Amino acid sequence: MMKKDSDSIFPNRRTLQERNQTRKRMVAHVLRAQFKKEFKTCRILVGNHFFTVDLMSNDDEIAAKIINPGITSHNKMSSGKFQQILSSIMILKSIDSKRKLLIFTNKKMYENFCASISSMPTPICDTVNGIEIAWIPLSDEFDNYEHSEPATDFRINQDIFGRARK
């Protein structure tokens, strides 16, 4: 009979999951302060598949997907991460919430995504129409293990596109 190891063969996986949960709590704190609503994680049915919405207001009017850091060693966003973000946008677009937020927790990721999406062909660039892209500055400090209090700054659609993407 085989015995399960008590130690994970992926020791960083648990740490990463814990860090992402901490980021989610911090973002929920900022959204609660910004919108005066409670937020929770929920699973929704889209077609015949269930998807996780990172944060949904209790009245279902605001849905948010959180984009955590994922920069390569060359300070670029990988194509896999870019595709993951596009997938998150498609899920947000399929939800009936009035406001749909794509929230970055790292300034470099936010800037890289905005620069990348604005330079894409129209079909890809237009995927962000109807989505509010925001940056909540916490991961720059948090990634260095120095963040202590939840950030309260919430920056939606800074003028990277030259026009608001709503």
Model-predicted regions and their roles:
Residues M2, L86, M90, A115-K166:
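Non-catalytic C-terminal interaction segments of nucleic acid-processing enzymes
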Residues M2-V46:
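Acidic-basic catalytic patches of nuclease active cores, encompassing PD-(D/E)XK
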Residues A33-Q34, S94-K98, T127:
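Alpha-helix C-cap/termination motif
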Residues K40-I44, F50-D54, K76-M77, L86-I91:
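Short secondary-structure capping micro-motifs at structural edges
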Residues R43-I44, I103-K107, I136-D140:
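Acidic carboxylate-rich catalytic motifs and surrounding loops in phosphoryl-/glycosyl-chemistry enzymes
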Residues G47-N48, M56-N58, S94-S97:
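Flexible, charged surface loops at secondary-structure boundaries
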Residues F51-N68:
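Active-site beta-strand-loop-beta-strand hairpin of nuclease catalytic cores
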Residues I66-P121:
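Catalytic cores of nucleic-acid endonucleases
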